[in-house]
Amino acid sequence: MPVSDSGFDNSSKTMKDDTIPTEDYEEITKESEMGDATKITSKIDANVIEKKDTDSENNITIAQDDEKVSWLQRVVEFFEVKNDSTDLADHKPENPIRTFKDLQESLRSTYLYNTDLRPVEAKRRTWTWKQYIFFWISGSFNVNTWQISATGLQLGLNWWQTWICIWVGYTFVAFFLILGSKVGNNYHISFPISSRVSFGIYFSIWIVINRVVMACVWNSTLAYIGSQCVQLMLKAIFGTNLNTRIKDTIKNPNLTNFEFMCFMVFWVACLPFLWFPPDKLRHIFALKSAITPFAAFGFLIWTLCKAKGHLALGSLNDNGGAISKTVLAWSVIRAIMSALDNFSTLILNAPDFTRFGKTYKSSVYSQLIALPVCYAIISLIGILSVSAAYTLYGVNYWSPLDILNRYLDNYTSGNRAGVFLISFIFAFDQLGANLSGNSIPAGTDLTALLPKFINIRRGSYICALISLAICPWDLLSSSSKFTTALAAYAVFLSAIAGVISADYFIVRKGYVNIFHCYTDKPGSYYMYNKYGTNWRAVVAYIFGIAPNFAGFLGSVGVSVPIGAMKVYYLNYFVGYLLAALSYCILVYFYPIKGIPGDAKITDRKWLEEWVEVEEFGTEREAFEEYGGVSTGYEKIRYI
């Protein structure tokens, strides 16, 4: 059979050396293909099984991760504060929180910027000079002011010497408060934000914590004064022997079961008012301003009538007027400083209420005049009341509530009605003072620290809970202890205020770029370093505290030289001025950035300006995304 050139025959598949029939070849090929297919299928099946096992394991891992995410997400969503802002820029979708690292990042971003900390836009800046005058009228008429004024009498001063000290002290207060309030008035930012400028984005947390602690202490203190009003109200109704009728199991020389019960009554009565936002409480403050002056003047007239117009116009200490000039001089200094110590917290957080000023001048002249006048008047009422009561009872009462308690010795219907009515108004006054001066500021500051989980309402309730852990009955057991406590707090706060004022007025010439206050990018003016800390401010802060610290130890019972105590009596001036001077010296040798034209500390320039922040949320978003901190976007907006 011939063989084709290709080596294959058409009728049978044959090679030149071997011949294989077509049928056998097809069968062999088929079997070979089937074998290969079986092997491939087996491998595929094995891979599929292996993949299924791997997917199953992955699914279990993913399911476990999802369970963790769901648990963490549910906890975060349950506790986080809901954003009720009407600005669309404030409702930017947030990345889901899958891990604790995501939570940390979320806490960081909300700390830097949130709706409670944004600058106040024009529609919310409604305070005119009238509102600031009414604010200080309302703030001055409270029992605490009377107690501060009585401190001078107990130090050995007579009534007119004490009153002069009150005028001088609160004039200094007004001056320092105006200095502290300028940044809020012009840039419409709160104290937690303004403190970032001087101390750094992150070290300002410590500064805000100082303010929170003070707010909690004062909240507890005023709550206890309010509870003393409740005591008088109950005594006027049920009799003056409630302390003995109610079994005493506390065994504290400064507290009985009855007094603690009254403290809890007042504390619980304050809680419902913490639920409402600050703008809803304006009616409470308006009512307080309207009725408290009538109660104060009514009490003065009642006391003068009981004393038949006779006043103990000399000093109220045991030595009468027989005190040396040196002792008199230091008594005057301590009486003046008591006013500054009393205001150390409000001086610090003045931007919290001046940021609502309608115009540049709304908060300046009104406060400069109204504050010392209002406090001098109410202090005079306290001085005259204490002096009149001294002619009646021959006892040094430093609180008007102690005088009202003595009125109940003559348990007539008229005395009972008068004591109940005045005590009720004083209790309401303490409630309003606590809300405006402590609960709301504490809530604001706590919001700045942890805004994702704390708003003003929650912060106010936290402040109320902390106040229970403080023992104000020991703090208020005497005027000397009260004054000592005030001085102790001022040691720390005066140094903070000194640094902030020096930074704003001398170093920065009144210039603040508010965009940089809300970012922690490396180029931010107020980051200073990777830790967000201005070390110059920290060192100056420590220098301001150091001279007063020995006297502070002496005030709590440690034996220290008399010179240290005299420095301590001047604690606010010493801490404020030394911290400010130290900061200026450090900045002179180690300049900071963020001042237009690289102005030096010795240059005669003033760069302060009135800033409009109507679209701040949108502008900040653009600044963060496009402008960064170095492209000059802020110059377009501010310079």
Curated annotation (Swiss-Prot):
Its transmembrane ranges are: 163-180, 201-225, 260-276, 284-305, 368-392, 417-435, 461-477, 484-507, 538-562, 573-590
List this protein's GO terms for biological process.
nucleobase transport; transmembrane transport; uridine transmembrane transport
A molecular function GO annotation: uridine transmembrane transporter activity
- Any Pfam family from its record, for instance, is Transp_cyt_pur
Q: Which GO terms describe its cellular component?
A: cell periphery; fungal-type vacuole; plasma membrane
Q: Identify residues that carry Phosphothreonine.
A: 54
| This protein's name | Uridine permease
Organism of provenance: Saccharomyces cerevisiae (strain ATCC 204508 / S288c) (Baker's yeast)
